[in-house]
Regions:
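Structured helix-beta-strand junction loops
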Residues: 13, 39-40, 153
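Generic N-terminal amphipathic, Lys/Arg-enriched alpha-helix
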Residues: 1-21
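A short, well-structured juxtamembrane/interface segment
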Residues: 21-39
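Hydrophobic packing residues in well-ordered alpha-helices of helical domains and bundles
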Residues: 7, 26-29, 55
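Short glycine-rich phosphate-binding loop at a beta-alpha junction
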Residues: 42-46
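Glycine-rich phosphate-binding loops that contact phosphosugars or nucleotide phosphates
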Residues: 51-166
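Residue-level recognition of alpha-helical structural elements
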Residues: 3, 22-25, 51, 133
């Protein structure tokens, strides 16, 4: 089987999407993350499904990959990495609280929340965002589709104008 045309079509689509990203918002996000690092603030990150895997990978890339080469390391904390904590909260309180409840125990004013939701409407992510905003934290939102509520609530919105989560 020859996938050459499929590969070309896929790459062309990816290039078009990348061209539509707002580089000013990406720059603002990087500056906020760096300012938070320099102030020794914490950066919380969360998402569901594939976005959870992305959140976990972000934590790894910044805490190990980037921090290995700088004096003041990043302090990323992925809210979906502790399965026992997630399951206890989901079982005893409700899945809509799995991220907000963890923030309640740890969040401080100079911290940042990076929230990832393809639709921008994941209820548990939105509850965490609202809680963090109420406590003076900045929000970086990563969204697709129309961006949903997360795009509206984010201080910095990294929105990919796509209608697929591939």
């Amino acid at each position: 089987m020859n996938y050459t045309n499929d590969i070309r079509d896929y790459l062309a689509l990816e290039i078009e999407i990348l061209k539509k990203l707002d580089v000013e918002q990406i720059n603002a996000a990087l500056n906020l993350l760096d300012e938070t690092r320099q102030k020794k603030g914490r950066i919380y990150i969360c998402g569901n499904g594939g976005s959870a895997a992305t959140a976990s990978h972000f934590q790894n890339d910044f805490n190990k990959g980037v921090s290995e080469y700088i004096d003041v390391p990043f302090r990323f904390h992925c809210l979906n990495d502790n399965v026992a904590t997630l399951m206890a909260i989901a079982n005893d309180i409700g899945y809509e609280e799995v991220f907000r409840f963890q923030l309640r125990n740890n969040l401080e004013e100079n911290d940042v929340l990076v929230a990832i939701s393809g639709s921008g409407n994941s209820h548990n992510v939105i509850r965490a965002v609202e809680y963090a905003k109420e406590h003076g934290c900045k929000i970086i939102g990563l969204t697709g589709f129309s961006g949903g509520k997360l795009k509206e609530l984010s201080d910095i919105s990294l929105h990919a104008p796509v209608n697929s989560m591939q």
